Regions:
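Phosphate/diphosphate-binding loops
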Residues: 184-198
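Helical "lid/switch" subdomain of P-loop NTPase nucleotide-binding domains
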Residues: 126-129, 150-154, 158
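Conserved H-loop
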Residues: 110, 142, 149-150, 161
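A short helix-turn-beta junction within AAA+ P-loop NTPase domains corresponding to the substrate/partner-engaging
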Residues: 157-169
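P-loop NTPase motor domains
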Residues: 1-132, 206
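Conserved P-loop NTPase motor module
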Residues: 200-236
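Conserved nucleotide-binding/hydrolysis micro-motifs of P-loop NTPases
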Residues: 73-75, 113-114, 150-153, 170-175, ...
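Conserved catalytic network of the ASCE P-loop NTPase/AAA+ motor domain
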Residues: 59-61, 96-101, 134-140, 157-160, ...
Length: 236
């Protein structure tokens, strides 16, 4: 736009330029291959019926006992929504399933601090859904397992509903104090050993055992790709 003596200045678009910036961001999402599953979906099941898709996810035909949903390639900003949607669908499936007692489901949430944050960190659709499952799921045959390296960042409502804890090495005082609040008072002193646990060692506390145990987990052979990189051996 030209004003006065011919000086040219940029003119903001509608809504003070916010709409233009929104269109640019939207175009970026549409062309991002990581979002292709949402904007250019493929037919993953033989039909578009929800019950058929759920049957495939839950392997209702009994051909397998474990289903792994790998969300590592999903953009971080929508992982929360996807986890919430999947957890709610599975919970509702067993909620209305008349044979729920013959079809118990365990949902395992890896790296839970990324999408099941404590209430002080922010809102989370996934957290609200999983909190409901933690409180009501047992009646409908749906239980949860929460895995996290930072328990202090995970919803206390969810962790407090857990009956058993497998606690590995923790050196952060905030995490240690958080665990002390979760375990029974008579076992709180055991948390003091957490910083001294070696790799593969864990402290098990809960209703599944008559008394707390300090155990050594056998190392897998061959080691998975997720094992720690031995920096010192590679650099020396």
């Amino acid at each position: 736009e030209k004003i006065g003596s011919g000086t040219t200045v940029a003119k903001e678009g509608p809504f003070y330029g916010k709409f233009t910036r929104f269109l640019v961001r939207l175009d970026g999402k549409l062309n991002d291959p990581r979002y292709a599953f949402m904007f250019r979906p493929k037919m993953y099941a033989q039909t578009a019926k929800l019950k058929d898709l759920l049957s495939k996810i839950l392997v209702a035909d009994g051909s397998a006992q474990v289903t792994i949903l790998d969300l590592s390639g999903v953009p971080f900003d929508i992982v929360n929504t996807i986890v919430s949607l999947l957890a709610r669908l599975i919970f509702d499936f067993n909620f209305w399933n008349p044979s729920r007692r013959d079809f118990p489901i365990l949902l395992v949430f890896e790296e839970a601090h990324n999408y099941l944050p404590s209430s002080g960190i922010g809102t989370s659709a996934a957290r609200r859904t999983v909190e409901r499952i933690a409180k009501e799921g047992r009646k409908y045959g749906v239980s949860i397992m929460v895995v996290s390296q930072r328990p202090v960042e995970v919803s206390e409502t969810i962790l407090s509903q857990c009956n058993n804890y497998v606690i590995m090495r923790l050196t952060n005082p905030l995490d240690q104090n958080y665990i002390k609040r979760l375990v029974p008072d008579s076992f709180a002193g055991l948390v003091d050993v957490l910083p001294s646990l070696r790799q593969g060692e864990a402290l098990i506390v809960g209703e599944a055992i008559s008394m707390p145990l300090r155990v050594q987990v056998d190392f897998p052979k061959p080691e998975p790709d997720s094992s720690d990189i031995k920096f010192y051996e590679k650099w020396k």
